[in-house]
A protein has these predicted regions:
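Short, C-terminally biased terminal segments at protein or domain edges
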Residues: 1-124
Length: 124
């Protein structure tokens, strides 16, 4: 079990969560009811699932939680793209979208590492 704060992907996803919470405050409720809350919940789920994963006792379970973090990453991207379309005052959010994509690549790589580790534990 490792400390998630030692992982760059966790630290960067925490930073992104803080940034997107600020962005979410700029989404007017009348333009997109519930979208702000959905965005906040989904972005918080990324570092939460990374942390939950690294706390698991087996590489296979770590990989499972990283897969959930990847799915949350896609969800955040979708909510953010929708918010940009519905609320032009938010701007393009290009930096946040780029960071989401970079984090996703990091998560895929980390998940692959744990999947391989899980397979090697099962192979006699």
């Amino acid at each position: 079990m490792q400390n998630p704060a030692n992982l760059e992907v966790w630290r960067r996803s925490m930073d992104l969560a803080v940034e997107l919470h600020r962005v979410a405050r700029g989404i007017p409720g009348r333009s997109a009811p519930g979208l702000s809350a959905q965005l906040r919940r989904a972005v918080a789920s990324i570092p939460a699932n990374i942390a939950e994963g690294v706390g698991q006792p087996s590489p296979g379970l770590v990989a499972k939680h990283l897969a959930i973090a990847i799915a949350s990453n896609f969800e955040v991207e979708t909510h953010l793209l929708l918010a940009v379309r519905l609320c032009p005052s938010l701007g393009t959010c290009d930096e946040a979208l780029d960071e989401l994509r970079q984090l996703r690549r990091m998560l895929y790589a980390l998940r692959t590492h744990y999947q391989r580790q899980s397979l090697s534990e099962r192979t006699p």
